[in-house]
């Protein structure tokens, strides 16, 4: 994914962290669904990375058609305390040089990236309740935020709405169940827009959850991450419910087109 951060009703803040070049080695690979992969990278030099939950790193790779160097950014899905190994969650985009590059990496391969970067990160100073809304692999930076929150026993009530298409697209559900067990103030709902027979969970677009379950936003801080249509529609819907800080990360597929 190629993320672009935008904010509504908040000031754009500097991440205040230097961008470095890192060398890392692929430690493990797991296929989570038919097109989503988890990649764990162990840092070699430097051996650790300091980042804020929600930030991203960038890879460079050659364009197979023109030969020019391309840059693609991927959100860190692991928590900052796991500073020696970082996790990426990403899906395969047909014709996408970034996901193609990452999908071809094998355990033991070495690679390089730059980071951390990005203004889409968890603000810890606010006392507002937290609402996280994700579509698809937009869960990646939000996962980092949720894990960081759980580690420090954040007392703020937090809710996650995550939209996927069908049962074959489900992943990380056991982890979310465990997070809700460990954190009584955390609620997670996964909704499927095109559920198949046998699905007993929430159905419909993730916007439906916002419409039905969020009466007021006056005491909320909202984090949105996903495709451009979801970001635009969710922002408009939230605006109708009142004023609150909204932090947005709009994903693009790595062909350069909005991931709709």
For each feature predicted by the language model, list its residue ranges.
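Residue-level signal for short, function-critical loop segments
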Residues: 63, 92, 136, 164-166, ...
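Ferredoxin-reductase
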Residues: 11-107, 194
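A short, basic/flexible loop-to-alpha-helix module at the beginning of a structural domain
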Residues: 115-126
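A structural signal for isolated positions on well-ordered beta-strands in alpha/beta enzyme cores
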Residues: 87, 112, 131, 159-161, ...
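Short, conserved phosphate/pyrophosphate- and ester-handling motifs at nucleotide-, phospho-/glycolipid
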Residues: 54, 138, 227
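Reductase modules of NAD(P)H-dependent flavoproteins
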Residues: 8-10, 18, 166-260
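Conserved S-adenosyl-L-methionine
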Residues: 151-157
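Histidine-anchored nucleotide/phosphate-binding helix
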Residues: 139-150
């Amino acid at each position: 994914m190629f993320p672009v951060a935008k904010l509504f009703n908040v000031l754009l803040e500097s991440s205040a962290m230097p961008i470095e070049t890192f060398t890392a080695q692929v430690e493990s690979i797991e296929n989570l669904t038919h097109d989503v992969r988890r990649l764990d990278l162990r840092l070699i030099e430097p051996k650790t990375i300091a980042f804020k939950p929600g930030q991203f790193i960038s890879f460079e790779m050659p364009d197979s058609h023109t030969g020019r160097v391309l840059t693609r950014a991927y959100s860190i899905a692991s928590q900052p305390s796991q500073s020696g190994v970082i996790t990426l969650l990403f899906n395969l985009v047909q014709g996408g040089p970034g996901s193609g590059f990452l999908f071809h990496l094998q355990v033991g391969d070495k690679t390089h990236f730059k980071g951390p970067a990005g203004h889409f990160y968890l603000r810890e100073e606010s006392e507002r309740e937290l609402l996280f809304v994700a579509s698809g692999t937009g869960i990646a930076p939000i996962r980092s935020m949720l894990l960081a929150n759980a580690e420090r026993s954040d007392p703020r009530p937090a809710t996650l709405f995550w939209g996927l298409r069908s049962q074959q697209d489900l992943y990380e559900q056991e982890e979310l169940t465990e997070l809700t067990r460990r954190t009584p103030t955390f609620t997670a709902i996964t909704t499927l827009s095109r559920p198949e027979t046998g699905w007993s969970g929430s159905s419909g677009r993730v916007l439906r959850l916002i419409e039905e379950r969020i009466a007021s936003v006056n005491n909320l801080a909202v984090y949105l991450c996903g495709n451009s249509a979801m970001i635009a529609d969710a922002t408009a819907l939230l605006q109708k419910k009142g004023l609150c800080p909204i932090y947005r990360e709009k994903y693009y597929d790595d062909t350069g087109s909005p991931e709709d």
